[in-house]
């Protein structure tokens, strides 16, 4: 009985592993069909409207991009952004 449960769990795990690359391929295809969405500039502001905040000057000039395939060069991932039902990486420098 334990062997049957173990084999069932392994089969389910194998199906899940095979299903994940298919979902990723579908998302990449949708992204490739819409060029120009990968590098969307986003202006990020920290602080209150009066500008009296305790932030560093480097944070005020933060430039971020929504990227589908990962951050480039000096950028680092600071979260996610979405367009429709697709999630992208929020890469800032």
From Swiss-Prot:
Proregion span(s): 20-58
Subcellular location: Secreted
Entry keyword set: Antibiotic, Antimicrobial, Defensin, Disulfide bond, Secreted, Signal
Coiled-coil ranges (or none): none
Protein name per Swiss-Prot or TrEMBL: Alpha-defensin 24
A single GO cellular-component term on record: extracellular space
Residue span of region Disordered: 23-54
Classification via PROSITE patterns: DEFENSIN
Reported function: May have microbicidal activities.
SMART domains with a match to the protein in the record: Defensin_propep, DEFSN
Record GO biological process: antibacterial humoral response
Family classification: Belongs to the alpha-defensin family.
Signal peptide from the UniProt entry: 1-19
Disulfide-bond pairs as recorded: 64-92, 66-81, 71-91
InterPro entries for this protein: Alpha-defensin, Alpha-defensin_C, Alpha-defensin_N, Beta/alpha-defensin_C
